[in-house]
Amino acid sequence: MSRLATVQRTTTETDIEIRLNLDQPEFEAPATGHGFLDHMLDALARHSRLGLSVRASGDLHIEPHHLIEDAGITLGQALTQALGDRRGIERYGSAFVPMDETLAHVVVDLSGRAHLAFEPETLDVWGQAGGMTHYHLREFLRGLCNHGGVTMHVRLLAGREAHHVIEAIVKALARALRDAVALTSDQLPSTKGSL
């Protein structure tokens, strides 16, 4: 079974192509035109050990929101395509990741049902990282959840500095996804018989 996907998303605001391979960790350096988003996508690929290629352009002269959100949407679509009927996947993943003073916890369920609980939006996270805030990250994750059929809970246990908060969350997501997409049986991981 091949767990590959290529998704192209073009709007008046962005043009994004994502290639995803759930079983081969070969990836290309992301090229979105937004340095910090590239850094986070690189971290996502490396720590999830998934093959990921992201080529994108967008209306960065306005603000990075559209590009970041649409990258999440496109990644969610690629994840849905690559997972197929989700037969045999572990389904759940959870990871804690520290980054200096920051500690993030991310839990995912690849149930096919979309939900994002994003605790950092209720906290006082300071500043931005390369023009990206934790609110931008929330929109990326919301797009991923809505279009990838992912239930995700994001908790921030310590830390307030935006760069460390965003990076710890992305790395925790990567490690949780790595576990959740793993093939561990030939059954659908559901008492309903479908996901």
Curated annotation (Swiss-Prot):
HAMAP family: HisB. It is found in: Cytoplasm. GO terms for biological process: L-histidine biosynthetic process. It comes from the Bacteria. PROSITE patterns: IGP_DEHYDRATASE_1 (PS00954), IGP_DEHYDRATASE_2 (PS00955). Pfam families: IGPD. PANTHER family: IMIDAZOLEGLYCEROL-PHOSPHATE DEHYDRATASE, IMIDAZOLEGLYCEROL-PHOSPHATE DEHYDRATASE HIS7. It comes from Deinococcus deserti (strain DSM 17065 / CIP 109153 / LMG 22923 / VCD115). The gene is hisB. Signal peptide: none annotated. It catalyses: D-erythro-1-(imidazol-4-yl)glycerol 3-phosphate = 3-(imidazol-4-yl)-2-oxopropyl phosphate + H2O. GO terms for cellular component: cytoplasm. InterPro entries: IGPD_sf, ImidazoleglycerolP_deHydtase, ImidazoleglycerP_deHydtase_CS, Ribosomal_Su5_D2-typ_SF. Pathway: Amino-acid biosynthesis; L-histidine biosynthesis; L-histidine from 5-phospho-alpha-D-ribose 1-diphosphate: step 6/9. Keywords: Amino-acid biosynthesis, Cytoplasm, Histidine biosynthesis, Lyase. This is Imidazoleglycerol-phosphate dehydratase.
